[in-house]
Protein backbone atom coordinates (compact mmCIF):
# COMPACT_ATOMS: atom_id res chain seq x y z
CA UNK A 1 0.00 0.00 0.00
CA UNK A 2 1.62 3.25 -1.10
CA UNK A 3 5.32 3.69 -1.63
CA UNK A 4 7.67 0.82 -0.87
CA UNK A 5 8.64 1.11 2.78
CA UNK A 6 12.04 -0.08 4.01
CA UNK A 7 10.85 -2.22 6.86
CA UNK A 8 12.66 -5.19 8.36
CA UNK A 9 12.75 -8.19 6.10
CA UNK A 10 12.34 -11.76 7.29
CA UNK A 11 15.59 -13.73 7.06
CA UNK A 12 15.49 -16.46 4.44
CA UNK A 13 16.22 -20.19 4.73
CA UNK A 14 15.72 -20.42 8.48
CA UNK A 15 15.32 -23.75 10.24
CA UNK A 16 12.51 -24.29 12.77
CA UNK A 17 13.47 -23.85 16.44
CA UNK A 18 10.06 -23.96 18.13
CA UNK A 19 6.98 -25.73 16.80
CA UNK A 20 3.55 -25.45 18.40
CA UNK A 21 1.05 -27.98 17.05
CA UNK A 22 -2.64 -28.13 17.91
CA UNK A 23 -2.21 -26.05 21.07
CA UNK A 24 -5.35 -25.61 23.15
CA UNK A 25 -5.62 -23.81 26.50
CA UNK A 26 -8.55 -23.04 28.80
CA UNK A 27 -8.82 -20.97 31.97
CA UNK A 28 -11.76 -21.60 34.33
CA UNK A 29 -13.59 -23.44 31.57
CA UNK A 30 -13.10 -20.63 29.05
CA UNK A 31 -11.17 -21.51 25.91
CA UNK A 32 -8.53 -18.81 25.30
CA UNK A 33 -6.43 -20.72 22.73
CA UNK A 34 -8.78 -22.90 20.66
CA UNK A 35 -6.37 -24.50 18.16
CA UNK A 36 -3.02 -22.89 17.43
CA UNK A 37 -0.19 -23.95 15.13
CA UNK A 38 2.96 -21.84 14.97
CA UNK A 39 6.57 -22.33 13.87
CA UNK A 40 9.32 -20.04 15.19
CA UNK A 41 12.58 -20.11 13.25
CA UNK A 42 16.17 -20.13 14.45
CA UNK A 43 17.66 -16.66 14.82
CA UNK A 44 14.57 -14.62 14.02
CA UNK A 45 12.91 -11.79 15.93
CA UNK A 46 9.25 -12.77 16.04
CA UNK A 47 6.57 -10.57 17.58
CA UNK A 48 3.18 -11.74 18.83
CA UNK A 49 0.98 -8.69 18.30
CA UNK A 50 -2.61 -8.07 19.27
CA UNK A 51 -5.01 -6.37 21.68
CA UNK A 52 -5.32 -7.21 25.36
CA UNK A 53 -6.90 -10.62 25.86
CA UNK A 54 -5.99 -11.97 22.42
CA UNK A 55 -3.91 -14.83 23.87
CA UNK A 56 -0.43 -13.61 22.98
CA UNK A 57 0.92 -13.68 26.56
CA UNK A 58 -0.65 -17.10 27.13
CA UNK A 59 1.25 -18.43 24.09
CA UNK A 60 4.47 -16.97 25.52
CA UNK A 61 3.86 -18.55 28.92
CA UNK A 62 3.10 -21.92 27.32
CA UNK A 63 6.42 -21.81 25.45
CA UNK A 64 8.21 -20.84 28.67
CA UNK A 65 6.58 -23.66 30.62
CA UNK A 66 4.87 -21.25 33.02
CA UNK A 67 1.50 -22.65 31.89
CA UNK A 68 0.62 -26.17 30.75
CA UNK A 69 -1.25 -26.96 27.55
CA UNK A 70 -4.62 -28.74 27.68
CA UNK A 71 -3.82 -30.44 24.39
CA UNK A 72 -1.25 -30.16 21.64
CA UNK A 73 2.51 -30.39 21.50
CA UNK A 74 5.46 -27.99 21.90
CA UNK A 75 8.78 -28.87 20.26
CA UNK A 76 12.11 -27.10 20.89
CA UNK A 77 14.85 -27.97 18.43
CA UNK A 78 13.06 -31.23 17.54
CA UNK A 79 12.72 -32.20 21.23
CA UNK A 80 9.26 -32.56 22.77
CA UNK A 81 9.18 -30.15 25.74
CA UNK A 82 5.39 -30.13 26.23
CA UNK A 83 5.71 -31.51 29.76
CA UNK A 84 9.29 -30.42 30.55
CA UNK A 85 9.49 -28.07 33.59
CA UNK A 86 10.27 -24.42 32.85
CA UNK A 87 13.71 -24.58 34.50
CA UNK A 88 14.82 -27.34 32.10
CA UNK A 89 13.71 -25.74 28.83
CA UNK A 90 16.75 -23.56 27.98
CA UNK A 91 14.28 -20.72 27.56
CA UNK A 92 14.49 -17.41 29.45
CA UNK A 93 11.81 -14.76 29.91
CA UNK A 94 12.07 -10.99 30.48
CA UNK A 95 8.92 -9.64 32.09
CA UNK A 96 7.51 -6.13 32.09
CA UNK A 97 8.47 -5.66 35.76
CA UNK A 98 12.11 -6.83 35.18
CA UNK A 99 11.99 -8.57 38.64
CA UNK A 100 15.52 -7.57 39.69
CA UNK A 101 16.62 -8.46 43.21
CA UNK A 102 16.80 -5.08 45.01
CA UNK A 103 19.36 -6.21 47.63
CA UNK A 104 21.81 -7.49 45.01
CA UNK A 105 24.21 -5.51 42.84
CA UNK A 106 23.91 -5.50 39.07
CA UNK A 107 26.73 -8.06 38.91
CA UNK A 108 25.02 -10.34 41.43
CA UNK A 109 21.68 -10.08 39.62
CA UNK A 110 23.24 -11.16 36.34
CA UNK A 111 25.30 -13.89 38.02
CA UNK A 112 22.32 -15.36 39.88
CA UNK A 113 21.25 -17.76 37.13
CA UNK A 114 24.80 -19.00 36.61
CA UNK A 115 25.18 -19.74 40.31
CA UNK A 116 21.84 -21.60 40.33
CA UNK A 117 23.15 -23.74 37.45
CA UNK A 118 26.32 -24.41 39.50
CA UNK A 119 28.53 -22.83 36.84
CA UNK A 120 32.23 -23.08 37.83
CA UNK A 121 33.26 -19.99 39.82
CA UNK A 122 36.10 -19.18 37.43
CA UNK A 123 33.61 -18.78 34.55
CA UNK A 124 31.11 -16.54 36.32
CA UNK A 125 32.96 -13.20 36.33
CA UNK A 126 34.02 -13.24 32.65
CA UNK A 127 30.55 -14.33 31.50
CA UNK A 128 28.76 -11.72 33.61
CA UNK A 129 31.06 -8.94 32.44
CA UNK A 130 30.65 -10.05 28.83
CA UNK A 131 26.85 -9.87 29.20
CA UNK A 132 27.08 -6.42 30.82
CA UNK A 133 29.36 -5.19 28.02
CA UNK A 134 26.76 -6.31 25.48
CA UNK A 135 24.19 -4.02 27.11
CA UNK A 136 26.77 -1.27 27.80
CA UNK A 137 26.56 -1.53 31.59
CA UNK A 138 29.97 -2.96 32.55
CA UNK A 139 30.77 0.18 34.60
CA UNK A 140 27.52 -0.24 36.58
CA UNK A 141 28.35 -3.73 37.89
CA UNK A 142 28.50 -2.71 41.57
CA UNK A 143 25.38 -0.54 41.61
CA UNK A 144 22.05 -1.58 43.09
CA UNK A 145 18.86 -1.59 40.96
CA UNK A 146 17.44 1.52 42.69
CA UNK A 147 20.50 3.47 41.47
CA UNK A 148 19.62 2.76 37.83
CA UNK A 149 17.20 4.36 35.39
CA UNK A 150 14.30 2.39 33.95
CA UNK A 151 16.19 1.76 30.73
CA UNK A 152 19.28 0.58 32.61
CA UNK A 153 17.18 -1.79 34.74
CA UNK A 154 15.70 -3.20 31.56
CA UNK A 155 19.19 -3.83 30.17
CA UNK A 156 20.21 -5.61 33.37
CA UNK A 157 17.16 -7.87 33.02
CA UNK A 158 18.18 -8.68 29.44
CA UNK A 159 21.81 -9.32 30.46
CA UNK A 160 20.59 -11.69 33.18
CA UNK A 161 18.40 -13.47 30.63
CA UNK A 162 21.14 -13.97 28.02
CA UNK A 163 24.15 -14.70 30.27
CA UNK A 164 23.40 -18.43 30.33
CA UNK A 165 23.00 -18.50 26.54
CA UNK A 166 19.40 -19.71 26.18
CA UNK A 167 18.12 -21.17 22.92
CA UNK A 168 15.20 -18.77 23.06
CA UNK A 169 14.50 -15.43 24.76
CA UNK A 170 10.89 -14.47 25.49
CA UNK A 171 10.00 -10.83 26.18
CA UNK A 172 6.58 -10.01 27.62
CA UNK A 173 5.68 -6.32 27.07
CA UNK A 174 9.19 -5.59 28.33
CA UNK A 175 9.35 -2.01 26.97
CA UNK A 176 5.90 -0.82 28.01
CA UNK A 177 7.01 0.66 31.36
CA UNK A 178 9.48 3.04 29.67
CA UNK A 179 8.73 6.57 28.51
CA UNK A 180 8.32 7.20 24.78
CA UNK A 181 11.85 8.48 24.04
CA UNK A 182 13.55 5.69 25.97
CA UNK A 183 11.24 3.09 24.46
CA UNK A 184 12.27 4.20 20.96
CA UNK A 185 15.93 3.98 21.93
CA UNK A 186 15.52 0.54 23.46
CA UNK A 187 13.71 -0.76 20.37
CA UNK A 188 16.85 -0.11 18.31
CA UNK A 189 19.18 -1.47 21.00
CA UNK A 190 17.14 -4.63 21.49
CA UNK A 191 17.10 -5.45 17.80
CA UNK A 192 20.84 -4.76 17.49
CA UNK A 193 21.50 -7.02 20.50
CA UNK A 194 19.38 -9.80 19.02
CA UNK A 195 21.38 -9.66 15.78
CA UNK A 196 24.65 -9.69 17.71
CA UNK A 197 23.70 -12.64 19.91
CA UNK A 198 21.97 -14.65 17.21
CA UNK A 199 19.43 -15.83 19.80
CA UNK A 200 15.81 -16.27 18.73
CA UNK A 201 13.63 -13.57 20.32
CA UNK A 202 9.86 -13.86 20.78
CA UNK A 203 8.43 -10.49 21.77
CA UNK A 204 4.88 -9.83 22.99
CA UNK A 205 3.32 -6.39 22.55
CA UNK A 206 0.09 -4.56 21.76
CA UNK A 207 2.11 -1.68 20.25
CA UNK A 208 2.10 -1.90 16.45
CA UNK A 209 4.98 0.59 16.11
CA UNK A 210 7.21 -1.62 18.28
CA UNK A 211 6.27 -4.65 16.21
CA UNK A 212 6.96 -2.94 12.88
CA UNK A 213 10.27 -1.47 14.10
CA UNK A 214 11.91 -4.54 15.59
CA UNK A 215 10.48 -7.67 14.01
CA UNK A 216 11.62 -9.98 11.27
CA UNK A 217 8.15 -11.49 11.43
CA UNK A 218 4.84 -10.51 13.03
CA UNK A 219 2.10 -12.89 14.13
CA UNK A 220 -1.14 -10.94 14.49
CA UNK A 221 -3.56 -12.51 16.99
CA UNK A 222 -7.22 -12.16 17.95
CA UNK A 223 -9.27 -14.35 20.31
CA UNK A 224 -6.53 -16.97 20.53
CA UNK A 225 -6.23 -17.34 16.76
CA UNK A 226 -3.68 -16.14 14.22
CA UNK A 227 -5.20 -13.54 11.91
CA UNK A 228 -2.07 -12.95 9.83
CA UNK A 229 1.55 -14.13 9.85
CA UNK A 230 4.14 -12.25 7.79
CA UNK A 231 6.93 -9.72 7.59
CA UNK A 232 6.30 -6.18 8.86
CA UNK A 233 5.97 -5.05 5.26
CA UNK A 234 3.44 -7.81 4.51
CA UNK A 235 1.34 -6.85 7.51
CA UNK A 236 1.51 -3.11 6.83
CA UNK A 237 1.17 -3.13 3.05
CA UNK A 238 -1.12 -6.14 2.53
CA UNK A 239 -3.43 -6.64 5.54
CA UNK A 240 -5.56 -9.76 5.10
CA UNK A 241 -8.73 -8.53 6.77
CA UNK A 242 -10.39 -5.54 8.41
CA UNK A 243 -9.22 -6.48 11.90
CA UNK A 244 -5.54 -6.41 10.89
CA UNK A 245 -6.13 -3.27 8.88
CA UNK A 246 -7.67 -1.39 11.78
CA UNK A 247 -5.13 -2.55 14.34
CA UNK A 248 -1.81 -2.14 12.59
CA UNK A 249 -1.96 1.61 11.81
CA UNK A 250 -4.18 4.58 11.06
CA UNK A 251 -6.08 3.91 7.86
CA UNK A 252 -9.12 5.16 5.99
CA UNK A 253 -11.79 2.68 4.97
CA UNK A 254 -13.93 3.88 2.07
CA UNK A 255 -17.15 2.08 1.16
CA UNK A 256 -17.40 1.01 -2.46
CA UNK A 257 -19.84 -0.77 -4.77
CA UNK A 258 -18.72 -2.57 -7.92
CA UNK A 259 -20.01 -1.14 -11.20
CA UNK A 260 -18.09 -3.30 -13.66
CA UNK A 261 -14.76 -5.02 -14.17
CA UNK A 262 -12.57 -3.15 -16.68
CA UNK A 263 -9.75 -5.70 -17.07
CA UNK A 264 -7.89 -8.38 -15.11
CA UNK A 265 -6.69 -5.86 -12.52
CA UNK A 266 -9.06 -2.89 -12.50
CA UNK A 267 -12.66 -2.46 -11.44
CA UNK A 268 -14.88 0.57 -11.94
CA UNK A 269 -16.61 1.25 -8.63
CA UNK A 270 -18.67 3.83 -6.82
CA UNK A 271 -16.41 4.92 -3.93
CA UNK A 272 -18.14 7.14 -1.35
CA UNK A 273 -20.47 8.43 -4.07
CA UNK A 274 -17.79 8.98 -6.75
CA UNK A 275 -16.83 6.72 -9.65
CA UNK A 276 -13.21 5.56 -9.43
CA UNK A 277 -10.97 2.85 -10.85
CA UNK A 278 -9.61 0.49 -8.18
CA UNK A 279 -7.32 -2.54 -8.30
CA UNK A 280 -9.09 -5.75 -7.20
CA UNK A 281 -7.25 -9.09 -7.27
CA UNK A 282 -10.27 -11.33 -6.62
CA UNK A 283 -13.50 -12.11 -8.44
CA UNK A 284 -16.29 -9.55 -8.03
CA UNK A 285 -19.78 -9.01 -9.39
CA UNK A 286 -21.68 -5.79 -10.21
CA UNK A 287 -23.33 -4.46 -7.07
CA UNK A 288 -20.91 -6.23 -4.71
CA UNK A 289 -19.86 -4.26 -1.62
CA UNK A 290 -16.15 -3.62 -1.06
CA UNK A 291 -13.86 -1.68 1.25
CA UNK A 292 -11.09 0.49 -0.23
CA UNK A 293 -8.25 0.98 2.26
CA UNK A 294 -5.81 3.89 2.03
CA UNK A 295 -3.49 5.44 4.58
CA UNK A 296 -3.25 9.23 5.07
CA UNK A 297 0.22 9.27 3.47
CA UNK A 298 -1.14 7.55 0.33
CA UNK A 299 -3.59 10.38 -0.41
CA UNK A 300 -3.15 13.74 -2.14
CA UNK A 301 -5.40 16.80 -2.23
CA UNK A 302 -5.71 18.81 -5.45
CA UNK A 303 -7.52 22.01 -6.35
CA UNK A 304 -10.68 21.70 -8.45
CA UNK A 305 -10.87 23.90 -11.52
CA UNK A 306 -13.87 22.24 -13.12
CA UNK A 307 -16.32 20.15 -11.06
CA UNK A 308 -17.46 18.26 -14.15
CA UNK A 309 -13.98 16.94 -14.88
CA UNK A 310 -12.67 16.47 -11.34
CA UNK A 311 -11.31 13.01 -10.55
CA UNK A 312 -11.37 11.37 -7.14
CA UNK A 313 -13.34 12.09 -3.99
CA UNK A 314 -14.69 15.62 -3.50
CA UNK A 315 -14.63 17.49 -0.20
CA UNK A 316 -13.79 20.65 1.70
CA UNK A 317 -10.66 21.46 3.72
CA UNK A 318 -11.70 21.80 7.38
CA UNK A 319 -8.32 21.75 9.16
CA UNK A 320 -4.66 22.17 8.18
CA UNK A 321 -1.92 21.13 10.61
CA UNK A 322 1.76 21.80 9.95
CA UNK A 323 3.92 18.97 11.36
CA UNK A 324 7.37 20.05 10.17
CA UNK A 325 8.12 17.46 7.48
CA UNK A 326 4.45 16.95 6.67
CA UNK A 327 1.24 18.91 6.26
CA UNK A 328 -1.94 17.24 7.48
CA UNK A 329 -5.23 18.30 5.92
CA UNK A 330 -8.60 17.22 7.28
CA UNK A 331 -11.08 17.07 4.41
CA UNK A 332 -14.84 16.62 4.84
CA UNK A 333 -16.27 14.65 1.93
CA UNK A 334 -19.58 15.64 0.38
CA UNK A 335 -21.23 12.76 2.28
CA UNK A 336 -19.88 14.04 5.62
CA UNK A 337 -17.02 11.54 6.06
CA UNK A 338 -13.84 13.08 7.51
CA UNK A 339 -10.55 12.14 5.81
CA UNK A 340 -6.99 12.89 6.97
CA UNK A 341 -4.42 13.52 4.22
CA UNK A 342 -0.71 13.62 5.12
CA UNK A 343 1.68 15.08 2.51
CA UNK A 344 5.35 16.00 2.59
CA UNK A 345 5.50 19.75 3.10
CA UNK A 346 6.92 21.93 0.33
CA UNK A 347 6.47 25.65 0.93
CA UNK A 348 7.41 26.43 -2.69
CA UNK A 349 4.63 24.27 -4.10
CA UNK A 350 1.55 26.42 -4.79
CA UNK A 351 -0.67 23.33 -4.41
CA UNK A 352 0.07 23.44 -0.66
CA UNK A 353 -1.53 26.85 -0.27
CA UNK A 354 -4.99 25.55 0.58
CA UNK A 355 -7.45 27.72 2.43
CA UNK A 356 -9.99 26.48 4.95
CA UNK A 357 -13.33 25.45 3.41
CA UNK A 358 -11.74 25.30 -0.05
CA UNK A 359 -13.27 22.65 -2.31
CA UNK A 360 -10.69 19.98 -3.16
CA UNK A 361 -10.34 16.56 -4.77
CA UNK A 362 -8.69 13.64 -2.96
CA UNK A 363 -6.73 11.30 -5.22
CA UNK A 364 -4.19 8.50 -5.00
CA UNK A 365 -1.96 6.56 -7.35
CA UNK A 366 -3.84 3.61 -8.83
CA UNK A 367 -2.80 0.29 -7.22
CA UNK A 368 -1.74 1.91 -3.93
CA UNK A 369 -5.09 0.97 -2.44
CA UNK A 370 -5.86 -2.32 -0.73
CA UNK A 371 -9.34 -3.65 -1.51
CA UNK A 372 -11.14 -6.14 0.72
CA UNK A 373 -14.54 -7.75 0.39
CA UNK A 374 -17.21 -6.50 2.77
CA UNK A 375 -17.10 -9.19 5.48
CA UNK A 376 -20.79 -8.66 6.30
CA UNK A 377 -21.91 -9.20 2.70
CA UNK A 378 -19.71 -12.02 1.48
Curated annotation (Swiss-Prot):
The keyword Ribonucleoprotein does not apply. ATP binds at residues 50-57. The keyword Zinc does not apply. This is Spermidine/putrescine import ATP-binding protein PotA. Part of the ABC transporter complex PotABCD involved in spermidine/putrescine import. Responsible for energy coupling to the transport system. Residues 18-248 form the ABC transporter domain. CDD domains: ABC_PotA_N (cd03300). It comes from the Bacteria. Belongs to the ABC transporter superfamily. Spermidine/putrescine importer (TC 3.A.1.11.1) family. It comes from Shigella flexneri serotype 5b (strain 8401).
Amino acid sequence: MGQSKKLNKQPSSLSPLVQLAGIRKCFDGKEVIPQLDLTINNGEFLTLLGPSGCGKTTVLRLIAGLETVDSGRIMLDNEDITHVPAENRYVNTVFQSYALFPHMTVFENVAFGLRMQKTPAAEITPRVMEALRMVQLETFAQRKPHQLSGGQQQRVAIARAVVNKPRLLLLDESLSALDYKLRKQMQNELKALQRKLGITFVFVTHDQEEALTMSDRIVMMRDGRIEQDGTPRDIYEEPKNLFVTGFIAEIHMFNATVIERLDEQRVRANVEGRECNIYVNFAVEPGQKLHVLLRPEDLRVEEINDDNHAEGLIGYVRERNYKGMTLESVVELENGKMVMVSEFFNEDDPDFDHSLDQKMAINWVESWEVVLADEEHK
